[in-house]
Regions:
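Sec-dependent N-terminal signal peptides of Gram-positive bacterial secreted proteins and lipoproteins
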Residues: 1-28
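Core dinuclear metal-dependent hydrolase active-site scaffold
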Residues: 22-79, 128-187, 193, 199, ...
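Short loop/helix-cap segments at secondary-structure boundaries that form the rim of catalytic
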Residues: 29, 47-48, 97, 115-121, ...
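Short, polar loop motifs at secondary-structure junctions
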Residues: 42, 109-115, 133, 219-224
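Active-site metal-binding motif and surrounding structural segment of the metallo-beta-lactamase
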Residues: 61-108, 179-217
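Short, aromatic/basic amphipathic alpha-helical patches
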Residues: 68, 92, 96, 113-126, ...
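Short hydrophobic/aromatic-enriched beta-strand-loop microsegments
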Residues: 102-107, 126-131, 233-236
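CN hydrolase (nitrilase-like) catalytic-core segments centered on the catalytic cysteine
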Residues: 210, 214, 221-224, 235-243, ...
Length: 266
C-alpha cells in the first residue's frame, strides 16, 4: 500500500510539472542557448548563450549583415567570424565597427587587412585574430574552433552550443574536412554548407558520411542525393516562415528564418 501511495505522489508531481511547464515547448523557450540561421541578402549564423553572442558570416555583403544585426537587435557581439576574405572585407569591418559593438573579430588570414582597419581596431580596443595557426574560443555554453583552408582565403569552423555540434563549411573546405585529423570527434548534429555550388556530388556525400549530421542546411542543388542518405534537408534561400528543428529529441531550439516572409524577431 505504501509503495502504491508513493508512486501515486510521484505521478501527481510529474503531471503538475507537465501542466505548468507545458512539456518540451516551455523548456525550449527557457533555454538560453540557440543556433539561428538567418537570410538577409547575406546568410548569417548567430550562436547565443547566457550573455554571449557569436555571429558567423560569409562576409561579402555589408548591407545584409548590418540589416540582420539591426533586425535581430544585436547591440553587442562578443565574436564576429568572417569565414572568407573578400574584396569588401575591409569595408565590412569598418562599417561593422562603426554601427555595432564587437569585442573580437576572427578572419581566415590577416594578409590583406588594411592599415586603416588595423588602426581602427586598435583605437576601439578590438582584438583581431587569424585562423591560420588555428583558433579556439571557449565559453560556458559556446565553444568554437576554426582553421584556415590551405591555398585559399577561406576557413572551416566547428562549434558546440549546449552540446550540439555544428560544422560551417564551404566548397573549398570539403576535402580538408574529410581528412581532418586534429579533431578527435568530427561527428556533427548540424552541417551548414555556405555558398556551395559544387557540381561533383561525390565530395558532398563523402563529407556527409564522415560527419554524419542529423540536419543539413545548405544552398546546394542536391537535395535528392542527400535525402537518400537519410538526412533531413533544408534550403535556406527557399525556406518560408519560421522553422523549429528538434535535434536529438531535446528541448533546444534551432531557428531557420527567411527574410522573404518579412519575419522580424521580437
Amino acid at each position: 500500500m505504501r509503495k502504491i501511495k508513493v508512486n501515486g505522489i510521484i505521478f501527481l508531481i510529474s503531471l503538475i510539472s507537465c501542466l505548468f511547464l507545458g512539456g518540451n515547448t516551455a523548456l525550449a523557450k527557457e533555454n538560453p542557448n540557440t543556433i539561428e540561421f538567418l537570410s538577409y541578402d547575406e546568410e548569417i549564423l548567430i550562436l547565443r548563450s547566457n550573455g554571449e553572442t557569436v555571429l558567423i558570416s560569409e562576409g561579402d555583403n555589408v548591407e545584409g549583415i548590418i540589416e540582420g544585426i539591426n533586425k535581430e537587435n544585436l547591440k553587442e557581439i562578443d565574436l564576429l567570424v568572417l569565414r572568407s576574405m573578400e574584396e569588401e572585407t575591409d569595408e565590412l569591418i569598418k562599417t561593422f565597427i562603426n554601427k555595432s559593438s564587437v569585442k573580437k573579430i576572427l578572419l581566415p588570414t590577416l594578409n590583406g587587412v588594411s592599415e586603416e582597419v588595423s588602426n581602427l581596431t586598435n583605437e576601439k580596443n578590438i582584438e583581431i585574430a587569424s585562423m591560420e595557426e588555428g583558433f579556439n574560443y571557449n565559453k560556458e555554453s559556446i565553444s568554437l574552433n576554426a582553421k584556415k583552408v590551405e591555398t585559399s582565403k577561406e576557413g572551416m569552423i566547428f562549434a558546440t552550443v549546449d552540446n550540439i555540434k555544428l560544422a560551417v563549411l564551404s566548397e573549398e573546405s570539403y576535402d580538408s574536412a574529410i581528412n581532418l585529423s586534429n579533431i578527435e570527434d568530427c561527428r556533427v548534429e548540424i552541417l551548414n554548407l555556405i555558398d556551395s555550388e559544387k557540381e561533383n556530388k561525390k565530395e558532398v556525400k563523402k563529407l556527409v558520411k564522415r560527419l554524419k549530421p542529423l540536419v543539413i542546411i545548405d544552398d546546394l542543388d542536391n537535395g535528392k542525393s542527400i535525402e537518400k542518405l537519410g538526412v533531413k534537408y533544408y534550403n535556406l534561400n527557399e525556406e518560408k516562415g519560421l522553422k523549429i528543428m528538434r535535434v536529438l529529441g531535446e528541448s533546444k531550439e534551432f531557428k531557420v528564418l527567411s527574410k522573404k516572409e518579412g519575419y522580424t524577431s521580437k
